Amino acid sequence: MKLQSLLVSAAVLTSLTENVNAWSPNNSYVPANVTCDDDINLVREASGLSDNETEWLKKRDAYTKEALHSFLNRATSNFSDTSLLSTLFGSNSSNMPKIAVACSGGGYRAMLSGAGMLAAMDNRTDGANEHGLGGLLQGATYLAGLSGGNWLTSTLAWNNWTSVQAIVDNTTESNSIWDISHSILTPDGINIFKTGSRWDDISDDVQDKKDAGFNISLADVWGRALAYNFWPSLHRGGVGYTWSTLREADVFKNGEMPFPITVADGRYPGTTVINLNATLFEFNPFEMGSWDPTLNAFTDVKYLGTNVTNGKPVNKGQCIAGFDNTGFITATSSTLFNQFLLRLNSTDLPSFIANLATDFLEDLSDNSDDIAIYAPNPFKEANFLQKNATSSIIESEYLFLVDGGEDNQNIPLVPLLQKERELDVIFALDNSADTDDYWPDGASLVNTYQRQFGSQGLNLSFPYVPDVNTFVNLGLNKKPTFFGCDARNLTDLEYIPPLIVYIPNSRHSFNGNQSTFKMSYSDSERLGMIKNGFEAATMGNFTDDSDFLGCVGCAIIRRKQQNLNATLPSECSQCFTNYCWNGTIDSRSVSGVGNDDYSSSASLSASAAAASASASASASASASASGSSTHKKNAGNALVNYSNLNTNTFIGVLSVISAVFGLI
């Protein structure tokens, strides 16, 4: 893989920075009052896609049609019969395949390895068209990220849809994106003055937010610190840069990029257990909310922070803007890393300083301030709950969100599985650290499969997958594997789900199994991780299988081919033999699997566990695995009112952080 040519302009933020009206009203980290329509209602029922997303899709479809057609022409260029493409890309737009890419969590490992995987799919990457899947990303409708994967997707999207190629080409420039040669704790290395100054600024930003009357948490600190790595060209890391700003960027407005989605989990304050029935939230440029029965609602992301009752501002005609800080939302999806800040005693800080800071930080965690606080609750009294769902979210004054992988669904698949989004195939990029050696073992797929049989999976479908032992014993965690290849075997599910192209992190030219908590990478390590990710997504630049490009093409067209009852290209039959999981189970116990970065134990109740993959998916589509009888269980855990937040402790920790890094 080559990553040499500068393929896009270095001025990646030009169109975004011109749209200053979409930024925080104060051009600072502090949300502010703005006028809004007297009759505005900020909350809607999750009964379908938003009007904004629906209109945006019309623009995106025009781009994906051309890009995907071009990609499939190249992928099937050696096929004996490609007449199906004429049908798929003819006048009937409903015949065109619709695809998405989902990037897993896993810290900088997931960000960098995932970057290589995306680079392999991006026709702006040098060599991607010759040795990779170039053009696939241009043909994608949705791009979802979670935790470290969200760092990747948000970096690209909120830098005016820059490319991994451009980031790599500008590595040596000042204010380069992803300059992680030093830990986020000591961003300027031995330059104690710059490091101290940055932490002073972060402390001031978060303190100002509190002084304005908003709840704060460690996620505010984490988000401000992250932002300097992802938006270094903006003033103080985009201190006033908002999530909704992307709406005003031409590259998004015109549908020239995929629709970005990030994922977070709801958490009950005072607990550390997040299970598969936790309420799963998504953020996109227009909205945030949940499809789950325990909320079943979305709100306008631009006006987060507004005090509402059933979507109506309490103060008529008055809203809040600027709460949707891009760094804060990015941090919300990765609050696992608050635990990194809580591990200061394992860093190279002088012990007396580390101990002092740790005391404050542990108090902060004990008071549940180590989560992201969305207050006032944007869904207060918004009663769109589905039948028998608990109402604790809408009864609370606060909404508490945590890392999107804490339910052990470390690949953000659930938003993409929604029937309303009509996806045919999802490329699931798995850079999880499930094994003792920090490789994935398929657990994320297993957990999403299981979720459909729990209380939150009433309207969810996911293809059959094996247990994690089978993943490892059959080597499915070391090479791309397709799941749900034959729709005829999936009819017992709620609906026919997208075909899943699973692409796990695996070793090719570099040891990509770095610790999630490795918080600094040299330039050579960064490039090595990206290069290895490229190779993992392409079967070693096609050296391991020269037919892999064509097989990816087969996966993309499969759902539409079956829907139309059209003839499958003969070459696809061999592809599916090579890459589709055929239902084989090998559940012999494997040591060192089933681990993850999260302290919680994501599980369903015993009855739902009985529908687990290892028990039910032994033959491609056993009717006994449909789980139809388990779809009616009571709703699971959700958030409840929790108002006793210890902000005094937090003020102390801000001062300590600033002092600590001024003394390094």
Curated annotation (Swiss-Prot):
The record's annotation in Gene3D superfamilies points to: Cytosolic phospholipase A2 catalytic domain
**E.C. number(s) listed in UniProt:** 3.1.1.5
Q: Which UniProt keywords apply?
A: Cell membrane, Glycoprotein, GPI-anchor, Hydrolase, Lipid degradation, Lipid metabolism, Lipoprotein, Membrane, Signal
Which molecular-function annotations from GO does this UniProt entry contain? lysophospholipase activity; phospholipase A2 activity
> Glycosylated where?
26, 33, 52, 78, 92, 123, 160, 170, 215, 277, 307, 345, 388, 459, 489, 513, 541, 565, 582
Domain PLA2c intervals: 35-586
A Gene Ontology term for the protein's cellular component? extracellular region
Q: Which GO terms describe its biological process?
A: glycerophospholipid catabolic process; glycerophospholipid metabolic process; phosphatidylcholine acyl-chain remodeling
User: What's the name of the protein?
Assistant: Lysophospholipase 1
